[in-house]
Amino acid sequence: MVVFSKVTAVVVGLSTIVSAVPVVQPRKGFTINQVARPVTNKKTVNLPAVYANALTKYGGTVPDSVKAAASSGSAVTTPEQYDSEYLTPVKVGGTTLNLDFDTGSADLWVFSSELSASQSSGHAIYKPSANAQKLNGYTWKIQYGDGSSASGDVYKDTVTVGGVTAQSQAVEAASHISSQFVQDKDNDGLLGLAFSSINTVSPRPQTTFFDTVKSQLDSPLFAVTLKYHAPGTYDFGYIDNSKFQGELTYTDVDSSQGFWMFTADGYGVGNGAPNSNSISGIADTGTTLLLLDDSVVADYYRQVSGAKNSNQYGGYVFPCSTKLPSFTTVIGGYNAVVPGEYINYAPVTDGSSTCYGGIQSNSGLGFSIFGDIFLKSQYVVFDSQGPRLGFAPQA
């Protein structure tokens, strides 16, 4: 089954971006807390499908072994300890929805009242407010690596996150959704935080929530604290010094493709000294895994006892009892360290003694994806001025 909060749309076209209207009020900053998904609603996750969809998100080629494993139906029931999904409450129109914040996409799309009762059952749904405006002739559609899809209409409505409201914000309301999404009861939609240039609304892309409201904020930035085994936070408009150690290290962002792309200066495995082999990659809260070049992945798993690249499971696996080495990314002279336990993602099936790695190949994408496996170890500032990214170890 697909985990739709961890994947995003294929870009369907680019043109002049239509801006929403922020509510005029004093400049401010605020923090919004994630919430844990309901423990009463356990979910099965096909781990190779998570991997396949992450590759498809960026137009990558999914290896045949991963396709085969993803279609085999093998799945693991995902309890809280695997950090599968933490969501953020957002008021869309008059309804509070739990959305996944995704720095790797630029769409705000939601389950809506346009879906049938059977498709929306178990979800909070968006109902256009009395002041909402439907954009006639505007549509959106997303497609994922496992063949799942969603599409619908576009409205302008109010969207509130924390203490900030955007009026006339583009809201992509689902009117059609495939069965994979219907089965995922934990998530009501997605709020994209990439650059507005890759918004997928046709015929004209729309601005993201962040681009709409950033003029209201004390500073045009947001900071992400994803946590290991716990809900995290998003700070909008300010940097919370209590959430990180030492000083922030900043690096430039190449936003030409619409993503928060940066270049790391090298990497290291375990206690070994980092090398100077650069890694270009995207900081993406909407991807679970850390996807790296084949050579980097091979370097890592050479130091993992019993690790192998498994055709059966569609990726690197290892004995669950194995103690994993850390992975270090060098950014502007700062060593961003991911502890080894973060990289042990989950057993391949319920009760299995074989575990699936949180580091996998980027399958020749040409760049890496620094997903949640990496981000959970860092306080990360997404600063639109520059633009630039700031990194520091979490407090």
UniProtKB/Swiss-Prot annotation:
Keywords: Aspartyl protease, Disulfide bond, Hydrolase, Protease, Secreted, Signal, Virulence, Zymogen
Catalytic activity: Hydrolysis of proteins with broad specificity. Generally favors hydrophobic residues in P1 and P1', but also accepts Lys in P1, which leads to activation of trypsinogen. Does not clot milk
Gene3D superfamilies listed in its UniProt record: Acid Proteases
Record domain Peptidase A1: where: 86-392
SS bond partners: 320-355
Top-level taxon: Eukaryota
Positions annotated as propeptide: 30-70
One GO BP annotation of this record: proteolysis
CDD domains (UniProt xref): Aspergillopepsin_like (cd06097)
EC number, as in UniProt: 3.4.23.18
InterPro entries: Aspartic_peptidase_A1, Aspartic_peptidase_AS, Aspergillopepsin-like_cat_dom, PEPTIDASE_A1, Peptidase_aspartic_dom_sf
Signal peptide: 1-29
Keyword Hydrolase: yes
Catalytic residues (UniProt): 102, 284
pH-activity note: Optimum pH is 5.0.
SUPFAM superfamilies named in the record: Acid proteases (SSF50630)
One term under GO cellular component: extracellular region
Pfam families reported in the protein's UniProt record: Asp
Family stated for the protein in its record: Belongs to the peptidase A1 family.
Its biological purpose: Secreted aspartic endopeptidase that allows assimilation of proteinaceous substrates. The scissile peptide bond is attacked by a nucleophilic water molecule activated by two aspartic residues in the active site. Shows a broad primary substrate specificity. Favors hydrophobic residues at the P1 and P1' positions, but also accepts a lysine residue in the P1 position, leading to the activation of trypsinogen and chymotrypsinogen A. Can catalyze hydrolysis of the major structural proteins of basement membrane, elastin, collagen, and laminin. Thought to play a significant role in virulence.
Protein name: Aspergillopepsin-1
Gene: pepA
